[in-house]
Curated annotation (Swiss-Prot):
Native species: Kluyveromyces lactis (strain ATCC 8585 / CBS 2359 / DSM 70799 / NBRC 1267 / NRRL Y-1140 / WM37)
Gene: DPB2
Protein name per its UniProtKB record: DNA polymerase epsilon subunit B
Quaternary context: Heterotetramer. Consists of four subunits: POL2, DPB2, DPB3 and DPB4.
InterPro entries: DNA_pol_a/d/e_bsu, POLE2
Key words, A-Z: DNA replication, DNA-binding, Nucleus
Length: 710
């Protein structure tokens, strides 16, 4: 598109034949009238009167179609998407032009003859540089009396630098050496994370720019973080459509026209858990029915997907965007190994009865999971976190596959990089905690990690307006605790200079503790106010006061850090199914009967013989599977765990992160990998006069549990 042209006004019907030949016949896109008008206006402005004879017009339309297909913008070319794609083409051309100018400037500086002659002597000055075939071979030595050869292809008058055979052989390693891993290490706060909304009609994410303040000194929604009503309306609808699209991508749901009522979702779960899955036949395909389509189909079997919650009568109901229906769970058989709580999105199979307008559930399960790579490919390789490049109004950043491969190789080279995750409830107001921290820092200072994660709460009593026996307010005492931690850290130069200190607040930390008093409050939770952390920020060079939850972009990986007692909340609100209770009763009766026949064998031995896995392992797997299948850090209804409406997207786990550091003090420490996502719980920091933490190596995803008695 180089050169100066006279703009022209092109009638859309004149452009239609060329656009139809390229966009429709070649790329399978359907052009709408407003989209054709936008294309004609741009082509007339850029290519002028001779746009027909200019081959760049065809190249532009082909580039337009390629970007359109890459971004998955659908089949219909409309005005809004045309303007977005054109803006992205402009942005790419601008970046390429800037890089080209910068490269030529650098080459001009490097190839300047005066600068070349003024270089000091070095071993490379006397090396013989072998150029490409057909170019001259010369010995460069400024101090020698031999004439200097300036042949075509030499490094002095060539536009490109020569590449030696050694560099060609090690091209990949040389490229990797140019990457600085610190440029791809980012700590992303939930309140500063870039916003994407999900458009279920186009099945793609839409970037939403942050609102700009009208005046600097005026309070605005951006400052107060007040959500709007639309965010509340779309809160669970967005979750529903994200999970539904994930379900429809599963091979069991590929055929929308066939559904065999005899192939229940329990059998589907068994097939999915098998290692060697036989080829799918048509009878195993399943179809999801909307609730509004149940009317008039009395006594028929259906499969529904919806939000599980209680209605105004206190009965269980299922809700989707088309409507809601009351559930009868007396005969429901749930799949084992998961929790069922109000707010979960579940698959239910059963029979609809028109008389009572109820749905008698025969089986219930969570949606099937999906691996991170599959989800990223399905959404068009979007960089939702902005880890590599931030998105803006004119450009939506995407994950570069080549860069991702290079970063992966760089991760393997940095195999010694490690993260230290301390256990939760680091009560700085207790002397035992300070002793444990001192013991931990003594060991870590010899080999400083990349980051140390401090999980709250950082005080044993919730911070609230009160005075203690010494007439010291709770806020002053809270600040003094962090000052004491800063004084302790000042003795470890390696840690305060080289290690990233990441602090994640807990339920007792301000300011949410003022309202919740240590109970469940709004999520995400804001960072600890700076008025309490001034000394820590002054002593530590790399300190991050993070929100809860928090995300880390480490090279090609995404790591989620969160502090929440999920195990207790899942157990408290888990639905009790009569069929499960009956099964437990029969199992206990069988154990008692076996014990009566053989009194020498204890009940514990009988249980261990039946199931060799410990209860703690089963519970941890149950928690992780529920969390990752729901693809949300808080799969509860709003009355159980309220969330900030317009920040619910920061709690989404779609796509699944590479690792989740879930600090849950109500559950024992565990390490569970599900669908390629490694979930780690360090447990409690102080346990029986011992400091517990975990060393995590992201390159190999290996963790080492440490326990330091003091």
């Amino acid at each position: 598109m180089a050169g100066v042209v006279l703009p022209a006004s092109i009638q859309p019907q004149l452009l239609r034949p060329l656009a139809y030949r390229i966009l429709t016949k070649k790329f399978g896109l359907n052009i709408k009238s407003d989209g054709l008008v936008a294309l004609a206006a741009y082509i007339g402005t850029v290519f002028g009167l001779y746009w027909r004879q200019n081959s760049e017009t065809t190249k532009f339309l082909e580039q337009f179609a390629i970007i359109w297909r890459e971004q998955g913008r659908g089949l219909f070319v409309d005005e809004l998407n045309v303007s977005q794609v054109i803006n992205e083409i402009k942005e790419r051309e601008k970046i390429e032009q800037d890089q080209h100018v910068e490269k030529r400037n650098n080459l001009h500086k490097a190839n300047n003859l005066d600068a070349f002659l003024k270089r000091p002597n070095s071993p490379t000055d006397t090396e013989i540089t072998t150029l490409s075939q057909g170019s001259a071979t010369s010995v460069v030595n400024p101090d020698s009396h031999s004439p200097m050869m300036l042949e075509e292809g030499s490094p002095i008058n060539s536009d490109s630098e020569p590449i030696s055979e050694h560099e060609r052989a090690n091209g990949i390693s040389n490229v990797d050496q140019q990457l600085d891993w610190l440029d791809y290490f980012k700590v992303i706060d939930a309140f500063n994370q870039q916003t994407f909304t999900y458009d279920h009609t186009k099945r793609q994410y839409i970037y939403v720019p942050r609102p700009k303040e009208v005046e600097k000194n005026m309070l605005s929604i951006a400052k107060l973080k007040l959500p709007n009503v639309e965010s509340k309306v779309s809160l669970f609808t967005t979750r529903y459509h994200i999970i539904k699209d994930k379900v429809l991508r599963n091979e069991k749901f590929q055929n929308n026209d066939i559904f065999n009522p005899l192939s229940s979702i329990i059998e589907m779960g068994k097939h999915m858990n098998e290692s060697d899955v036989s080829p799918l036949n048509s009878a195993s395909y399943m179809k999801i029915t909307q609730i509004k389509n149940l009317l008039g189909h009395d006594g028929k079997n259906f499969l529904l997907l919806g939000l599980l919650d209680q209605n105004s009568k206190g009965n269980w109901s299922l809700e989707d965007p088309s409507g809601s229906i009351e559930l009868h769970l007396q005969q429901a058989i749930p799949t084992k190994g998961t929790y069922y709580v109000p707010g979960c999105i579940v698959l239910v199979e059963g029979i609809y009865y028109t008389a009572s307008n109820t749905f008698v559930v025969s089986s219930i399960t969570h949606p099937p999971g999906e691996k991170r790579e599959d989800t990223i490919e399905a959404i068009g390789n979007l960089d939702l976190l902005g880890a590599y490049n931030p998105s803006n109004e004119n450009y939506v950043a995407r994950l570069d596959k080549d860069l991702k491969i290079r970063l992966h190789y760089l991760e393997q080279e940095l195999s010694d990089n490690k993260f230290v995750i301390l256990g939760g409830d680091i009560y700085l107001d207790e002397m035992t905690t300070m002793d444990g921290l001192k013991k931990t820092f003594d060991k870590l200072t010899t080999d400083p990690p990349v980051a140390i994660v401090f999980n709250g709460s950082f005080v044993s009593v919730p911070v609230h307006p009160s005075l203690n026996a010494k007439n010291v307010s709770a806020t002053v005492s809270y600040k003094n605790n962090f000052d004491a931690l800063a004084t302790l850290l000042s003795n470890y130069e390696n840690l305060i200079n080289d290690t990233h200190m990441i602090f994640i607040p807990g339920p007792n930390d301000p300011w949410t503790s003022m309202v919740g008093l240590g109970t469940t409050t709004m999520w995400p939770q804001k960072i600890i106010p700076s008025s309490f952390t001034q000394k820590m920020s002054r002593i530590c060079r790399k300190v991050h006061w993070g929100s809860n939850p928090l995300r880390i972009a480490y090279l090609s990986q995404e790591i989620v850090l969160t502090r929440d007692d999920l195990a207790n909340r899942f157990k408290r609100y888990n639905i009790v199914f009569p069929t499960v209770e009956e099964e437990k009763y029969l199992e206990n009766a069988e154990l008692q009967e076996q014990y009566s026949r053989n009194p020498d064998v204890s009940v514990g031995q009988l249980i261990a013989f039946k199931n060799n896995l410990p209860v703690s392992v089963l519970e941890s797997r149950k928690l992780v599977k529920t969390l990752l299948d729901q693809q949300h850090l808080s799969p509860f209804s709003s009355r159980i765990r309220p969330t900030v409406w317009d920040l619910d997207f920061t709690l989404q786990l779609s796509p699944l992160p590479s690792s989740i550091m879930l600090c849950d003090t109500s559950a024992p420490a565990f390490d569970v990998t599900y669908n390629g996502c490694k979930t780690i719980n360090p447990g409690r920091f102080i346990h029986k006069r011992a400091a517990k933490y975990i060393e995590f190596f992201p390159a190999s995803k290996v963790l080492v549990e440490e326990e330091l008695p003091f």
